[in-house]
């Protein structure tokens, strides 16, 4: 409340500059490094996690929306993503991992760990946000690629042995989710594996029983959960004016979705994919994790 009151006192022309300054201070490397070092003292980390965390980059872009000042949560998400991939690969590994796709890469929350976990792979970092993939190219050596709202027209120009798609299905409507799955089918190399995350029963319970809204108005969130309970899928656009559509010129098709495993499997089959892995709440104890390969 105090922050909102103070914001009204600041001239409108100054607000973007002051906001950028605040974000730069919050993401200052010295601050982030201290947060990482605190996490390194966690006795529950495995030796492998500690080794990755000890070497991972501290550089967080000030526009990284995944970092809101909590370095521990930020780095834990990356460590959990590596664990997800390791579990999938223990079940179904490509012949070799030479080409790796991170879509959406954002500003590298997971990618900074992937480049350490798979040092022999060539990475493609793809995102719709201007500057995000370029940051990943500069900091982590990835090939940058710009995404688009209409995924049916996206051609990345190569096939991939392993693809990670963290928390994108969580924001797409049914049609866009199917197009994303078809994109995987087009871009997977023989034996390649696509791994993605989605909101399922856990998030539905949080909305229905705990009043969580996931940045939707309460009635929209309730409608999403109700549709999910009836059909296995629920979706609603984010409301306007929250900044979510800055990179989506159509002004729609980006919000909150709930997808049951059965619904995902039907869509994947329609896209020509076969499931090889599923774990409820596998990523950060929050999002469900799926892995698919192209049907033979």
Which residues are covered by each model-predicted region?
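Class I (Rossmann-like) S-adenosyl-L-methionine-dependent methyltransferase catalytic domain
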Residues: 8, 20-100, 106-155, 174, ...
């Amino acid at each position: 409340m105090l922050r909102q009151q103070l914001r009204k006192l600041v001239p409108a022309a100054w607000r973007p500059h002051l906001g950028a300054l605040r974000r730069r201070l919050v993401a200052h490397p010295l601050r982030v490094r201290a947060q990482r070092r605190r996490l390194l003292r966690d006795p529950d980390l495995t030796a492998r996690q500690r080794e990755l965390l000890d070497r991972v980059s501290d550089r967080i872009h000030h526009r990284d929306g995944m970092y809101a000042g909590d370095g521990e949560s930020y780095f834990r998400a990356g460590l959990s993503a590596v664990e997800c991939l390791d579990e999938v690969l223990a079940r179904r590994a490509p012949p070799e991992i030479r080409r790796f796709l991170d879509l959406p890469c954002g500003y590298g929350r997971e990618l900074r760990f992937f480049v350490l976990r798979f040092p022999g792979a060539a990475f493609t970092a793809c995102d719709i946000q201007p500057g995000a993939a370029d940051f990943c190219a500069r900091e982590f050596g990835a090939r940058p690629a710009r995404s688009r709202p209409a995924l049916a027209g996206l051609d990345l120009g190569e096939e991939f042995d392993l693809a990670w798609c963290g928390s994108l299905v969580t924001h797409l409507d049914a049609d866009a989710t199917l197009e994303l799955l078809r994109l995987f089918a087009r871009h997977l190399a023989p034996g390649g594996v696509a791994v993605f995350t989605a909101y399922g029963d856990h998030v539905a319970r949080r909305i229905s029983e705990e009043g969580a809204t996931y940045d939707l108005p309460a009635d929209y969130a309730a409608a999403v959960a109700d549709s999910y309970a009836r059909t296995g899928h629920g979706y609603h656009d984010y409301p306007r004016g929250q900044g979510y559509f800055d990179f989506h010129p159509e002004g729609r098709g980006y919000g909150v979705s709930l997808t049951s495993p059965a619904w995902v499997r039907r869509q994947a089959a329609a896209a020509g994919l076969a499931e090889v892995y599923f774990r409820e709440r596998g990523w950060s104890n929050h999002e469900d994790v799926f892995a698919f390969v192209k049907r033979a």
